């Protein structure tokens, strides 16, 4: 995004600490997102459809720390004049990266919504890598179309006498800014909030269904059925009059009669054993079903909680800047008031690129395992070297 060079030339006592803080902030953004990218490269188990979208988010946020902030530091602190070419490159790149980060959050939220609300169809889909890459590329194309053409077209609207400020030509056109803020902030917030509400609603319905007697009656019915079969087998085995008579007159029966008695006894014993096995199978299946449902509910709650945190961080980091930008656009370019709060709101957007890796990827167990795997790989050469020295 853009902020006019309103600070002027600061004294050296303030320039050096601020430059150090800004550079450290950019470096922290790069490190946090680089860990996510490296984890995706190292661990093949992370190459799942939803994790590709986290990779896309990490790439956009990483480039914010690599390009947007480093170019901005000398401009805002040391009054370095970009020049028209570098200024245009910085504006398009910064707007593109920030908007792509926002749209990646929307794509991640939609994917999580599909995995919870339509779990069966989501798992049945075998999305190819080309389709996933197409969705990732579509995010970047849409992000460019939101601001890129307007930045290029409005370059001629700038006042030629003021060449120190690197900002788009439409910053004083409130209606254009309103449309762009609608596309890059308000609609994404509404979309992510909608997906999050739908996830909570789906979890609530699933939980209510699991507590419903008709749903829970499966295990009871199966248990009673197995008990009935078991009792029937025992009754057939103990109350058969033919068996009692055969036992009483076993010395007077022919060998053929004895063999038929043994066959009948063996048949009843097998039926009782079969009934017992069926009852045990039904009970184990019911317990496994309840465990799977409980695991799905826990997974859905975790996803919903992570999306709620992701949405809250995005709204907090972007809302102040959008509000300030629209309000300041109503002033003429040369009469806009200078405000420290606007500078803070401006940096909050980039702060969102810093917190994104810690909101979901680095808190996910698979990403954590991949992170420790990276550390083990880096420590392994040093360990082998120490062993060779000791030997």
UniProtKB/Swiss-Prot annotation:
Family stated for the protein in its record: Belongs to the G-protein coupled receptor 1 family.
Ranges for region Disordered: 238-258
Residue ranges of the TM segments: 20-40, 53-73, 88-108, 132-152, 175-195, 307-327, 344-364
Membrane association type: Multi-pass membrane protein
GO MF assignments: histamine receptor activity
Cellular compartments per GO CC: membrane; plasma membrane
Name of the protein in its database record: Histamine H4 receptor
Subcellular localization(s) per the UniProt record: Cell membrane
Cytoplasmic compartment residues: 41-52, 109-131, 196-306, 365-391
Keyword Transit peptide: no
Organism: Mus musculus (Mouse)
Extracellular side: 1-19, 74-87, 153-174, 328-343
Subunit and interaction comment: Interacts with TSPAN4.
Gene: Hrh4
Compositionally biased residues, Basic and acidic residues: 247-256
One Pfam family in the UniProt entry: 7tm_1
Function: The H4 subclass of histamine receptors could mediate the histamine signals in peripheral tissues. Displays a significant level of constitutive activity (spontaneous activity in the absence of agonist).
Keywords, sorted A to Z: Cell membrane, Disulfide bond, G-protein coupled receptor, Glycoprotein, Membrane, Receptor, Transducer, Transmembrane, Transmembrane helix
Keyword match Disulfide bond: yes
Sugar-bearing residue positions: 5, 159
Source domain of life: Eukaryota
One of the GO BP terms on file: inflammatory response
Disulfide bond annotation, renumbered to this chain: 87-166
Cross-referenced Gene3D superfamilies: Rhodopsin 7-helix transmembrane proteins
């Amino acid at each position: 995004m853009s902020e006019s060079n309103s600070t002027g030339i600061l004294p050296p006592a303030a320039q050096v600490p601020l430059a150090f803080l800004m550079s450290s902030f950019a470096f922290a953004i790069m490190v946090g997102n680089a860990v996510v990218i490296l984890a995706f490269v190292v661990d093949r188990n992370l190459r799942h459809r939803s994790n590709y979208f986290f990779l896309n988010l990490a790439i956009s946020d990483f480039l914010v720390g690599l390009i947007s902030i480093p170019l901005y530091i000398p401009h805002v602190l040391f009054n370095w004049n970009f020049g028209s070419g570098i200024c245009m490159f910085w504006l398009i790149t910064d707007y593109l990266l920030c908007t792509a980060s926002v749209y990646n959050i929307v794509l991640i939220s939609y994917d999580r919504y599909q995995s919870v609300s339509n779990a069966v169809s989501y798992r049945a889909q075998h999305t190819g890598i080309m389709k996933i890459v197409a969705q990732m590329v579509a995010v970047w194309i849409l992000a460019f179309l939101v601001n890129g053409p307007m930045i290029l077209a409005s370059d001629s609207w700038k006042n030629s006498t003021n060449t120190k400020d690197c900002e788009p030509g439409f910053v004083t056109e409130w209606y254009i800014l309103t449309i762009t803020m609608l596309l890059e902030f308000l609609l994404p917030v509404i979309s992510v909030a909608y997906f999050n509400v739908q996830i909570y609603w789906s979890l609530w319905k699933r939980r209510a269904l699991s507590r419903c007697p008709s749903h829970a009656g499966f295990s009871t019915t199966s248990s009673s059925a197995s008990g009935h079969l078991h009792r029937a087998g025992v009754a057939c085995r103990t109350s058969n009059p033919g068996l009692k008579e055969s036992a009483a007159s076993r010395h007077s029966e022919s060998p053929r009669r004895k063999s038929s008695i043994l066959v009948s006894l063996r048949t009843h014993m097998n039926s009782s054993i079969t009934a017992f096995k069926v009852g045990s199978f039904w009970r184990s299946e019911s317990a496994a079903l309840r465990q799977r449902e409980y695991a799905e509910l826990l997974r859905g709650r975790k996803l919903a909680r992570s999306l709620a945190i992701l949405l809250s961080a995005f709204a907090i980091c972007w809302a102040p800047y959008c509000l300030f930008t629209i309000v300041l656009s109503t002033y003429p370019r040369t009469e806009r008031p200078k405000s420290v709060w606007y500078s803070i709101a401006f940096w909050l957007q980039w702060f969102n690129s810093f917190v994104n890796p810690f909101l979901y990827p680095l808190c996910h167990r698979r990403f954590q395992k991949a992170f420790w795997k990276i550390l083990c790989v880096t420590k392994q050469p040093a360990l082998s070297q120490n062993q060779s020295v000791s030997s």
